Each structure stands twice: as structure tokens, then as C-alpha cells.
Amino acid sequence: VRAVQENFSLTATGFMMSGYFVGYFIGAATIPNLISRVGHIRVFAAFASLASLVILIHSIFINPFVWFILRVLTGVSMVCIYTVAESWLNDRSNNKNRGSVLSIYMVILYSTMGIGMFLLNFSSPENYQPFILVSIITSLALIPILLTKKKPPTFKKIKAMSLRELYEASPFGMVSSLFYGTIQSALFTLLAVYAASMNFSIFEISFVTFLLAISGAVSQFPIGKLSDIYDRRLVIVIVTFGAAIFSICCIFSVGLMYLPEGHATTKNWFFLFLTLFSFCSLPMFSLILACLLYTSDAADDTPCVD
């Protein structure tokens, strides 16, 4: 939103936002060695602190290239934080309840993401206050994990897994994760930018991103529970088909916004179809992850990154 207000071009905005996933890739490749050296808790603390710092720097340097570098650092930080959390949950779950456990985790994640979107309404994105507020919230995440008495997962020495080995171990899981990652990265990165370019108000921008996150949160547990009862691959196929249908509906609802005012429907149709699309698509992350981890459970000699 701030990038649109600063009149960054769409190309510059897309380039800047892609830095998050560049950092995500870098972090995913390096975090196993970090965890093996210093442990889960120290990795979480270090990168939560880095994320909090990087957020503040955004408000100092208003430049697409600088923001690209900052987004890379944010991506590295967040993938390390997520990996610690998810490996901890994986260590405490088994194949019988993993779908439900990961779904509860995703409910919490998406719910807080959705609620956090409304922070845009406390102060204009043109000011520095939103950056400070997000930095404070990020820093607060350190307190529970630094004070916990629970023992972190025991880190097991892992073998690097090539893409070919991953495909042979779980072809469905690998292909699904590639498509899911491509779609969801574009959605979460550019939805707010798209809404701003459509002249949505600040409240409407926060509301549409809230709908995206909260509907995904609501659907996590029931769909995760179904995946524990039925074949996860079948559940993934069904929700993928539903997401495809509702994404097409979103396209047509956007077209209605360009009709003359007397004949156009309101933005409510777009909100409705986006909600249904999110309801079907967002649970796929936990389902795909559970599929990949099931392969690891089924074969002790299958290398798997926590």
C-alpha cells in the first residue's frame, strides 16, 4: 500500500515484493545448519529480532531497491521463524493427528494475519507509526519462547534431498507444493497492491486482505480433519477444483466493477468469491505439508528437513 502511495511503478513494486520469497528460498536452504549449531530457540530469537529491526528500516529509506533488500531479509527471518514453529509441532504430532494439528496452527496464523490487516486503519501508511507498531508486535513474539520450560525438538542430522529424490518420494506432494507456492505467493504479495490500484479505500484494502486470511483460517480445521479421515490427495484435488471455480468467479466479478454505475453490482460479489476461493485454497498448505511428512514417517531412511 505504501509503495502505491509513493507512486512506485507496478514493475518496481512487483520486483520489491518478490524479495520476500527470494529471502524465503535462501532461509529455507540455510536454516537446518543454523538449528543444528545453536538450536531452535536461539534461531527463533535471532531472526524475530532481525525481522523487528528490518521493519523499522522501511520507514527510513523509501526506495524500491532498498526495500527489495529489506524484503529479502524479512523473507529469511520469517522462514526461519516458521520453520522453528512447524518443526516443533511436527515433533509433537504423528500421522494420525498431524492434519488437525497443522490446521489449528494455520487457523492461528491466518486469523492473526487477517486481524493485523486492520492496523492499516490506525494510522496512514504514509506515516511511520504502522512500522513501529508492527515492530513492537514482532518483538513481543520473543517472550513466550524465551521463557518456555518445554524442551525444544531434538535436532536430527539430516541428509540433503535433491528435487529428484523429493519427487520420487512424494510426486504428488512436490508438484502440489510448487503450484501452491506460485499461486499463493502472488496472491499474498499483490492482492493489497491490486486493491489499491483499483482505488479501494484503506478500510476496503484491509477488509479484502482480512477476508482472504480469515476465511482460510475458518476452513483449516474442518478440511484438516477430513484429511485425517480420507485420503489427503483426494481432499487436495477437491479443494483445488473448488478454488479454481471461485477464482474464475472472482475474475468475472472484477469485470462487473467496470460497468456503468447503473448496471454494475457492488464490490460485494468480489468479496464473496474471494472469500470462497480462500476457503478452498489456503488449507492446501497444511494438507500438502502433511503429505510430504507422511512420506517421511512411512520410510525411516527418507531424508526430511524439519
Where are the regions that the model predicts?
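Paired small-residue
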Residues: F65-L73, N268-L276
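Structural signature of the two symmetry-related core transmembrane helices
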Residues: V43-L56, V235-I248
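Helix-breaking motifs and short loop linkers at transmembrane-helix boundaries and internal kinks
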Residues: F61-I62, D231, S253-V254
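Residue-level signature of mid-helix packing/kink "hotspots" within the transmembrane helices
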Residues: F21-F25, A29, M113-G114, A213-A217, ...
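Cytoplasmic helix-loop-helix junction between adjacent transmembrane helices
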Residues: T74-Y105
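Helix-to-loop junctions at the C-terminal end of transmembrane segments
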Residues: A28-G39, Q220-D231
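Conserved small/polar residues in nucleotide/adenosyl-binding loops
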Residues: Y294-D301
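C-terminal membrane-cytosol helix-exit motif in multi-pass small-molecule transporters
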Residues: S135-T154
